[in-house]
Each structure stands twice: as C-alpha cells, then as structure tokens.
Amino acid sequence: MEVAPLVAEVLKRQQVHVTFFAANERTKEGDGSLGDHWAPWWRARAAEGHELASHTWNHTYWRADAGSAPHPAFRVRPSAGPREGQSFVMSAAEYCEEITRAADRLKAISSKTPLPLFRAPGGKTSAQLIASAKACGYAHVGWSPAGFLGDELPSETASNTALLNKALRDVRSGDILLAHLGIWSRKDAWAPAVLEPLIEGLKQRGFCFRTLRDHPDYAAAAAQVR
C-alpha cells in the first residue's frame, strides 16, 4: 500500500477506473491494508467510481486439493494474518469465508458493494476451488498473459523500462491487466513510475480502459450488484 496514494493520483489524472482486489495484508503504516488506517483510501476510491472485489482475507494461497466432492477441501498457506506462512487444510466453507470476509470489510469501509468476483493469490486455483467459490457466489478472475505487468519480478532482471516496453508491445483488446499497490521485494518500484507512461502509451495505441463490470466475461456476474 506504500504507493497507493500515488497510484490513485495517476488514475484520477488519467481518468481511468480499475477493479481493486483487496486482502488484509501487512502494511508499513496502520493495521493492515483493510484496517482503519487505510479505510479512507478505499472509501475515496469507491467514490471515484473504481470497483472493489475480494483477494481473500489473509491473502490465502491454494497449494493443493485436499478433499473431493461432496466434501471439498484445500491445502492452503496464507501470507498474512495469524497463520501467516503455515500450511494447513481448509474446508470449502472456510475458503468461502476467506473470500466473503474481505468483501464484507470492503463494503463496510467503502459503503460500496464489491463485485461478486475474487482473485486467488498468485492466481493459484483448481477446478474444485473455482467450483466451490462459484457455489458461494463468487467467480474467479485471472489475468491475460500479456496483462501480467511484471511488478512482482526482481528489478535487477526486469527493469521498469523493459516491463513498460513489453506491455506496450503485447497488450491486446480485452486483456485484463494485473499490477499491485506496492511490492515489498522489488527495489525499483514499478508504480507509479511505469503506470502513467503505460496508460498514456496504450491510449496512444487507441485503447480505453474499463473495470471488470464491463468485461464481457464478467458483466453478467457484475450485473448482480448495482
């Protein structure tokens, strides 16, 4: 969240709306990204017209399926929360609670109902996990291959210039782009350094930007929320 205010400034200046997927991760300031310290930031983004969705409460990574129907379960490893770094088995109902808890907190602090979508940390899923989430009302959203903007990669091997040039070359219409509100391990921060020239460059190529509410793959699910 360290660069979140700068990202918000760029998006506002460029008149671009995005979909934020949020988990309650550790932050340098405050009591987590969905804590009270950052609540005004989320409220302001919702008021500006951005969409919100769940990234699971404890940024919980799926590792493997650990049970099958009619009692699906998953081996998981959260990267936040009281069980950070631990590997354990979570029932489908417990995983749904992970999704719902983040969505409920977003609604509470922003006064805006999140979209019935979620993104699994790392994009790691199984057919069974996706089916279990769908059963409790959430569709999973990944990203396009060209939409992986590389802000998680080491800056020593993936410079901002190289990442910008790759995205400007490869992004196509309909692609879902993925970036973060700061990556602890990256020395040369991707945002906002790359974000604004990327938006400007894609606009010059004739692109416009929409939230997932308007994406053809997710519009039907998003229409459930007004």
Kindly give the residue locations of the regions a language model identified.
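Charged helix-capping and loop-helix junction motifs
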Residues: 34-38, 159-163, 191-195
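Basic- and aromatic-lined ligand-binding clefts that recognize polyanionic substrates
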Residues: 108-133
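Short histidine/acidic/glycine/proline-rich micro-motifs that form metal-
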Residues: 24-29, 124, 147, 183-187
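His/Asp/Glu-enriched short active-site or ligand-binding loop at hydrolase and phosphoryl-transfer sites
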Residues: 124-170, 206-218
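Structural recognition of the beta-strand scaffold that forms the well-ordered cores
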Residues: 18-22, 51-56, 116-120, 139-144, ...
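C-terminal domain-boundary segment and adjacent tail
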Residues: 13-14, 18, 187-226
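Active-site beta->alpha N-cap acidic-glycine motif
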Residues: 1-90, 94, 98-115, 190, ...
